[in-house]
């Protein structure tokens, strides 16, 4: 997938988040969509900055560390932890939603600057 396609996917998922935010019952969906948007922003940013990206989310943390992007790798690791706790562990409340939205904002800023 090319950089612009990753950007469009991220923006589409962010639009879905905006539509879902008014319903507290959608916290798991918000977290999942934020995670997906973050992945696409990371791919977009890696293509822009390094002319390459990882096609899969497995191993993404190590890939980012290999690029020298330790801070971004930590944000992704945090995203993975919150996502798994919400999806598999029933920990998807308001604070988790707020955390992933803040992480998503940081990742989008990294990708677009």
Please give the residue ranges for each predicted region.
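Terminal alpha-helical segments
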Residues: 1-113
């Amino acid at each position: 997938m090319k950089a612009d396609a990753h950007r469009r996917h991220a923006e589409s998922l962010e639009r879905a988040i905006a539509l879902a935010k008014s319903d507290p019952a959608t916290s798991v969906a918000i977290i999942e969509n934020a995670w997906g948007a973050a992945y696409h922003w990371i791919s977009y940013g890696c293509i822009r900055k390094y002319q390459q990206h990882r096609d899969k989310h497995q191993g993404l943390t190590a890939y980012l560390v290999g690029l020298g992007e330790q801070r971004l790798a930590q944000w992704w690791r945090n995203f993975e932890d919150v996502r798994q706790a919400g999806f598999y562990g029933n920990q998807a409340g308001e604070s988790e939603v707020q955390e992933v939205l803040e992480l998503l904002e940081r990742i989008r800023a990294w990708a677009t600057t």
